């Protein structure tokens, strides 16, 4: 199975990694992306945008909603952790969600998923009428034109077609191993192999 969709473009394959996971290869042992699973929300000729989906931070939704003065009426959400989404705009909230809905500032990813940055979605979440499935992050990961493609050729990232099951039905610590299992690879053994290469 191909992990990347290719189109022929003047002798060079053009990759479209929208709705794919990026796994940080174990050679990245330091920095913000070490051990991360990143979901690519948009990838085109201008670059790529994704959010890290397996790195919760020490901030609950209840605390975040208090900080932005939005009541959170769904008590079961108040202890859910916000995630580190990436180093770009690290103070801004991003909501990856299903179903899409109609929001003021939304990037439609595919027929099921969207990434929303406007406050209206947070207000509806606070009222208990928000999307059924969601991951809320602070910040995102961004790549300039050609940067992600170059990093992939340098073996910085492994690409895997994304799964809503992994995004929304597994705890953060289970997402990376589950994504790797789609390829039949145990991430922990991959990490050990790098240490012995």
Regions found by a protein language model. Name each.
Residues 2-136, 141-197:
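A short aromatic-anchored loop/beta-hairpin motif
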């Amino acid at each position: 199975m191909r992990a990347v969709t290719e189109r022929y473009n003047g002798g060079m394959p053009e990759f479209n990694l929208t709705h794919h996971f990026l796994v940080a290869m174990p050679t990245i042992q330091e920095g913000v992306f070490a051990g991360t699973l990143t979901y690519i929300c948009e990838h085109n000729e201008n670059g790529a945008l994704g959010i890290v989906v397996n790195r919760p931070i020490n901030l609950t939704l209840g605390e975040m909603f208090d900080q932005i003065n939005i009541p959170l009426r769904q008590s079961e959400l108040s202890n859910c952790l916000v995630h580190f989404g990436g180093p770009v705009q690290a103070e801004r909230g991003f909501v990856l969600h299903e179903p899409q809905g109609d929001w003021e500032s939304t990037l439609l990813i595919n027929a099921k998923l969207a990434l929303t940055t406007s406050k209206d979605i947070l207000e509806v979440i606070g009222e208990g009428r928000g999307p059924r499935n969601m991951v809320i992050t602070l910040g995102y990961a961004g790549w300039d034109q050609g940067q992600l493609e170059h990093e992939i050729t340098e073996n910085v990232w492994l690409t895997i077609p994304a799964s809503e099951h992994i995004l929304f039905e597994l705890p953060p610590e289970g997402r990376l191993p589950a994504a790797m299992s789609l390829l039949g690879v145990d991430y922990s053994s991959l990490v050990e192999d790098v240490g012995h290469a």
